[in-house]
């Protein structure tokens, strides 16, 4: 049994970036993977306090909130796909808090050798989608995640109103392609390495 983690950064319930994430997770469900999908719109996660003397090297964050569910999912998963709406040409603040909080467990490197993909949705063309995708992938690389593209990079889309993305068959298809690519790489890694982690 293999496991995939989806993190939807949008503060909107059923936002466009979350819809694309669900499409990206479809291939995993079809192949019998176990899926965990965290919606930050339903969670309470505080920003990092930079209290390094309390978390550095301990693999434990002192903040008591819903982030502990995500911490538990990092070592559990074989793959991770993260989606974000674009705010001020970058990652939304809700997702940024999650990415920053990885610092508290960085020494444990729970995502090293996992396979990842990224999705970003903005209101307009050239609205910061590529910057957002790159920010997610840069974070993944710093965690030791093997980043996998969709057709080109991650999946980027333009959608200004709730549910707009459902009218864009091409983007929905691209999200599924991203999911398939992440799945294929993760399965090949598992076949070649077994339970061992990449160096």
Locate predicted features.
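Short, glycine-/small-residue-rich phosphate/pyrophosphate-handling segment
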Residues: 93, 107-153
């Amino acid at each position: 049994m293999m496991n995939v983690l989806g993190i939807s950064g949008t503060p909107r319930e059923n936002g466009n970036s979350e819809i694309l994430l669900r499409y990206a997770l479809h291939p995993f469900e079809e192949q019998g993977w176990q899926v965990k999908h965290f919606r930050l719109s339903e969670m309470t996660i505080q920003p990092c306090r930079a209290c390094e003397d309390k978390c550095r090297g301990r693999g434990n964050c002192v903040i008591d909130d819903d982030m502990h569910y995500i911490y538990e999912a990092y070592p559990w998963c074989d793959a991770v796909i993260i989606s974000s709406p674009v705010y001020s040409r970058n990652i939304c603040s809700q997702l940024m808090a999650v990415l920053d909080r990885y610092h508290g467990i960085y020494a444990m490197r729970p995502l090293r050798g996992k396979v990842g993909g990224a999705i970003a949705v903005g209101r307009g063309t050239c609205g910061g989608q590529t910057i957002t995708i790159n920010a997610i992938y840069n974070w993944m690389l710093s965690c030791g995640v093997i980043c996998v593209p969709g057709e080109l990079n991650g999946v980027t889309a333009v959608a200004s109103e709730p549910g707009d993305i459902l009218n864009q068959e091409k983007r929905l298809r691209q999200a599924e392609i991203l999911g398939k690519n992440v799945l294929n790489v993760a399965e090949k890694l598992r076949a070649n390495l077994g339970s061992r982690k990449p160096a």
